[in-house]
Amino acid sequence: MPSLWDRFSSSSSSSSSSRTPAADRPPRSAWGSAAREEGLDRCASLESSDCESLDSSNSGFGPEEDSSYLDGVSLPDFELLSDPEDEHLCANLMQLLQESLSQARLGSRRPARLLMPSQLVSQVGKELLRLAYSEPCGLRGALLDVCVEQGKSCHSVAQLALDPSLVPTFQLTLVLRLDSRLWPKIQGLLSSANSSLVPGYSQSLTLSTGFRVIKKKLYSSEQLLIEEC
């Protein structure tokens, strides 16, 4: 799949100049590739565990401590964020995300087209901008892992990087959920062992508007920040 940065480099250059000069970019090192591998491992490990346990197991806090920790985290109001470049990149990222979801494979036998409601697209975009606001390279420094929660397991769908030439400075794991009203459809999709594959997509499934984003700074030892929406 062509990188998002290559596809939109011409339009991005006209919006504004880069937030961080090339000389200020983080040095390329082994942790850049290690971050990508870690993101894939995180999504893979979720496939055999309850996604809800991710909040406590990764943060190092119990339910009460974790809640109080998040209460103390201060993020800027979205109205105060005004970065034309990041907003432009975010719109392109959401387009690439929807394309990746339209080619998702939840089960091992049949593909499915996962659809994001417009409300979900808007909410995810705003949350990514909020989490990227304090980063040295903004949204360009993000490595986005996309997972879809199904019952007590998660399926890794995609890993997206806005600028593959830039060593990522922070990692976001986006956990989406299937609409619970579609359970009969989902069960039929995953249990169709004897049905043969046909070209195209057998099912179109709508995602719930609820989601979770887990942020990890790759240049810091800070605790994971978990945003539940």
Curated annotation (Swiss-Prot):
Organism: Mus musculus (Mouse)
UniProt-listed InterPro entries: RTP801-like (IPR012918), RTP801-like_C_sf (IPR038281)
Entry protein name: DNA damage-inducible transcript 4 protein
GO cellular component: cytoplasm; cytosol; mitochondrion
Localisation: Mitochondrion; Cytoplasm, Cytosol
Keywords: Antiviral defense, Apoptosis, Cytoplasm, Mitochondrion, Phosphoprotein, Ubl conjugation
Induction: By dexamethasone, heat-shock or osmotic stress. Up-regulated by hypoxia, in a HIF1A-dependent but TP53-independent mechanism. Up-regulated upon energy stress. Up-regulated in brain from MPTP-intoxicated mice, a model for Parkinson disease (at protein level). Up-regulated by hypoxia in bowel, liver, spleen, heart, lung, brain and kidney.
Residue positions where Phosphothreonine is found in the record: T20
Gene3D superfamilies per UniProt: RTP801-like (3.90.470.40)
Main location, first listed in the record: mitochondrion
Post-translational note: Phosphorylated by GSK3B; this promotes proteasomal degradation.
A biological process from GO: intrinsic apoptotic signaling pathway in response to DNA damage by p53 class mediator
Keyword Repeat: no
Region feature Disordered, mapped onto this chain: 1-68
Assembly behavior: Monomer. Interacts with BTRC. Identified in a complex with CUL4A, DDB1 and BTRC. Interacts with TXNIP; this inhibits the proteasomal degradation of DDIT4.
Biased composition (Low complexity): 9-18
Molecular function as annotated in GO: 14-3-3 protein binding
